[in-house]
Amino acid sequence: MTEVNTQPEVNIGLVGHVDHGKTTLVQALSGSWTDQHSEEMKRGISIRLGYADATFRRCPGVDAPECYTVDEECEDGSESEPIRTVSFVDAPGHETLMATMLSGASIMDGAVLVVSATEDVPQAQTEEHLMALDLIGIENIVIAQNKVDLVDRDRAVDNYRQIQEFVEGTVAEDAPIVPVSAQQEVNMDLLIDAIESEIPTPDRDPGESARMYAARSFDINRPGATAAELKGGVVGGSLVSGELSVGDGLEIRPGREVDEEGQTEWRPLETTVRSLQAGSNDVESARPGGLLGVGTGLDPSLTKGDALAGQVAGEPGTLPPTRNEFEMQVDLLDRVIGSEEGDDGDVEDINTGEPLMLTVGTATTVGAVTSAREGECEVSLKRPVCAEKGAQIAINRRVGARWRLIGVGTLS
């Protein structure tokens, strides 16, 4: 049997409205891999950010798309051949979790937009998530029309047409629409075929400096462990460039807040890579794709409870600066979208003094606008971020009781 590198090589976001079946679809696609998370729990490294890895396989001698499967055994009893392993990022579809979806989008190479055939199109978060993909610049998209087993043919065809109308003029205009039933595992071969053709593994330069966006961090020590048994803190995230190996030096920015003579400042953390876990395997080195668990020499009190989520880690001396304030070019949407209360309205210009919620990479922070001019503004941040010039920033404004996506900024 052909061996496949089980480290995922591409991150695919699953986005869409709450209850449209994203998580069920992950289970159908990750096949026999769904129990790996309990294994991670036993080993003390749970690096699950709504992530699941799936190995796509092909049955020899069968034409596409019927040849595609996630099962190791084909229908005729022969062994399937692995093609590639992908990592699915399951983005929350609930409107209050939009910031989580946006921070996940920063590490997606492509996306599957899940739309239920049982409801009219678009639902609130379907629209908001598609707009977010458009803003962040994710162009490799496949649309899964889910739950087709729950409607009759006429309703399914009508819903299909609604989807076509909805995506017209958006980044998903040419995306294939695949009717599926995640619950009954119907048309998974067609969906894999579409993903294989529409969401290729990006060309990455292994010679670039290692850079990782931290999405989680934790202390894996059990209460009562002796000093000799203590392990360093673990950082979970996605490597976006370069290669990381056990023994490498690691710098983490912004780092931690220290109090110096009544003044607080942020100082980078420096440590070494003690262990690496990719997929559910311990590895000596890792490349971009999937979620990575990095065991470090850091005091576990610095990493517990996701304390380092949103930070950037990489080769010492190569990271962008830590910023307490920045200026950005602003591109606002025409209207506020994704509201279920019907408070959609025109997006007004950003004003000096107003608070904004900003997502930069996997970091979400609140900033106060210190100066606003047409097409640009300056913000002072409550929590600093590590970001380089040209970084994309998702801008959210308080509308009613919720934060709403109103545009995208480019750090200048």
Curated annotation (Swiss-Prot):
Catalytic activity entry: GTP + H2O = GDP + phosphate + H(+)
Disulfide bridge positions per record: none
Its EC number(s): 3.6.5.3
CDD domains in the cross-refs: eIF2_gamma (cd01888), eIF2_gamma_II (cd03688), eIF2_gamma_III (cd15490)
Region (G2) location: 44-48
Annotated stretches, region: G5: 181-183
Keyword Chloroplast among UniProt keywords: no
Cofactor(s) the record lists: Mg(2+)
GO process terms (BP): formation of translation preinitiation complex
Gene Ontology molecular function terms on file: GTP binding; GTPase activity; metal ion binding; translation elongation factor activity; translation initiation factor activity; tRNA binding
Ligand binding (Mg(2+) 2): D19, G44
Binding residues annotated for GTP, in chain numbering: D19, H20, G21, K22, T23, T24, N146, K147, V148, D149, S181, A182, Q183
Annotated ranges, domain tr-type G: 7-203
SUPFAM superfamilies: EF-Tu/eEF-1alpha/eIF2-gamma C-terminal domain, P-loop containing nucleoside triphosphate hydrolases, Translation proteins
Stretches for region G1: 16-23
Keyword field: GTP-binding, Hydrolase, Initiation factor, Magnesium, Metal-binding, Nucleotide-binding, Protein biosynthesis
Pfam families: eIF2_C, GTP_EFTU, GTP_EFTU_D2
Residue ranges, annotated region (G4): 146-149
Stretches the record annotates as G3: 90-93
Gene Ontology CC terms, in alphabetical order: cytosol
Cleavable signal peptide: none
Amino acids binding Mg(2+) 1: T23, S46
Chain's role: eIF-2 functions in the early steps of protein synthesis by forming a ternary complex with GTP and initiator tRNA.
Subunit structure: Heterotrimer composed of an alpha, a beta and a gamma chain.
Protein family per UniProt: Belongs to the TRAFAC class translation factor GTPase superfamily. Classic translation factor GTPase family. EIF2G subfamily.
Name of the featured protein: Translation initiation factor 2 subunit gamma
Gene behind the chain: eif2g
